[in-house]
């Protein structure tokens, strides 16, 4: 039984609609066996993505503003390769997304760890000279809270003051469980300060590995060149299939179908954190995504707990690896993307029993 943040249950994906779209793509490929394809991505897929994110996330863009990538990680890589030079100052949330930090460091950047609070990134801590700011404003990773409206405006103002580009990683944004969803930060951007990154790998299937970036014109042209030099273009069959999948409304149906499943799992974990697990942990009230974070109360050894839980076949994951600087806030990431509803109580019973033995 795993409470992994990374894994997703594949049984929630309807194979019939996906297979029909893939068959369509195979038939289409036979009609264009020697056609050259744009590094930017197929126009029909970019049109479908632009329509989807305008409706779902309030993103202002057209198909010409989009670059199709092999997942969000390649989108981050291409943007960073275009903008980051050795010694370049990059700011990102702490705690934050380790692969983004590792990417910036690998390209020679100086990465500043900016603390977060209940309203998100603490903008006043962004250092002078920063050229790139990486944030997850809709659903802070890993803690889960959204960035407040005043903080969003402050971030845009600070980026304009610095002449910096903001990378908005809008991961896990499709699944929201209560309250109105805040639009993407990019919607507030009137000056081309935001590069918006998204992916279908988490919403649909991890194996899909298709993501996208909405980029300011100056960045887009260079990123398309970098994409071409990297791998020419993302897999054409998958692009045709996904364009069809989006165009026929299957994504929205999938989200509506899965929402009830994930919502029930989330509510069950919250109920346990608010009852018999409350002497040891307090939940951060995140309202979107596929995981919850729970902060440990004084005296709880999270690393020991995670190790002991694995011995009773429960996968637990500590918050510690997501912090780059002290003070680390001890706690757990509790993913509900892969675990079945009926397995949550048995898994958390074992966690509770382990905590009682440690107390």
What is each stretch, according to the model?
Residues 190-193, 198-260:
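Conserved core segment of the aminotransferase class I/II
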